[in-house]
A protein has these predicted regions:
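A hydrophobic alpha-helical transmembrane-helix feature that marks the membrane cores
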Residues: 1-305
């Protein structure tokens, strides 16, 4: 199994283990040293207990306190439910001050949401090795909703209809990726993951350079769009942001594959049930990233018309 680049899945519970590392597969040495006499003395009691166990309904992973795919799905749905509720709040807040005299939407909701979400994401990532706190993950979803609602309202104000386009595109990418993964046609590999990590580092460096250049006025207002190099330059008539955007969407889709793979590995490892929250958190991080990248790519395309 290839390791996920998503920090949510950095915990050992989501990493592949050898059979010797998996609990319950190798009996302790002390158990193998019981004498035959002791075994015979307890045989009747053990037999009676086994008869009762066989007669009772089998315990599922949830009954034994283990992480399951189904439980992870339910928690993912819950997180996105919280995100949608606060996204509505962010949208209303962004547009509340728009009037004929003041036609500019507020950027406060998505700035607050982005900063709050980033801080909570770091806290969840670095504290989950000791203890998983669902309340922090739910709070992260709430801040991400504020961010998504705010930035979506802002983009919709500038490019009407863009939110529906970005939402449908995001759902399509997630749906196709999930279907291909479930069918076994797409799987993570160590070689592909190495390429993915190199591409991610390159993209982060490019983004940092782009932001710095924008801060220092390298791209004056009205000289090609609000996204710096992404909207200022083009290759064969295609905006650089669209070319990079397509590559980033592919990267985000592969990141989803890594997320799904990590969740399956966590289930195989018998990770405790709270790790389902961490799996749901990891999926949300990737899907939000995917949506924002698609939103920006469509904005660059429409701004270039």
């Amino acid at each position: 199994m290839a390791s996920s680049s998503n920090p949510a899945f950095a915990h050992p519970a989501f990493q592949e283990r050898s059979s010797a590392q998996r609990p319950g597969l190798t009996p302790p040495a002390a158990q193998t040293q019981f004498s035959t006499a002791s075994a015979q003395a307890t045989d009747a009691a053990v037999h009676a207990q086994l008869e009762g166990a066989y007669a009772a309904p089998s315990a599922g992973a949830i009954d034994t306190g283990r992480m399951t795919v189904e439980d992870t799905v339910l928690k993912t749905v819950a997180l996105f439910g919280v995100l949608l509720v606060t996204a509505v709040v962010g949208w209303i807040w962004t547009m509340a001050g728009v009037t004929a005299a003041n036609p500019s939407p507020s950027i406060a909701p998505w700035i607050i949401g982005a900063l709050g979400g980033f801080v909570l994401a770091m806290v969840v990532t670095f504290t989950s090795r000791k203890k998983i706190r669902p309340a922090l993950i739910l709070a992260y979803a709430a801040f991400e909703g504020l961010f998504i609602g705010g930035i979506s309202a802002f983009f919709e104000f500038v490019w009407p209809g863009i939110v529906v386009q970005a939402t449908l595109a995001t759902l399509s990418v997630v749906g196709v990726t999930l279907a291909l993964f479930a069918s076994g046609k797409v799987r993570a590999s160590k070689k592909a993951t190495k390429v993915f990590m190199i591409a991610m580092i390159g993209y982060l460096v490019f983004s940092l350079i782009n932001v710095v250049m924008m801060m220092f006025g390298a791209f004056p207002a009205g000289s090609g769009g609000p996204f710096g190099m992404l909207s200022h330059y083009s290759i064969m008539g295609i905006p650089l942001g669209v070319i990079i955007g397509v590559a980033v969407v592919i990267m985000a889709a592969y990141s989803l594959v890594l997320d799904f793979d990590s969740i399956q590995q966590g289930v195989r490892n018998g990770a405790p049930r709270p790790f389902a929250w961490l799996g749901a958190f990891g999926i949300m991080v990737t899907v939000v990233w995917l949506y924002v990248e698609i939103l920006r790519m469509i904005a660059i395309l429409r701004g270039n018309d």
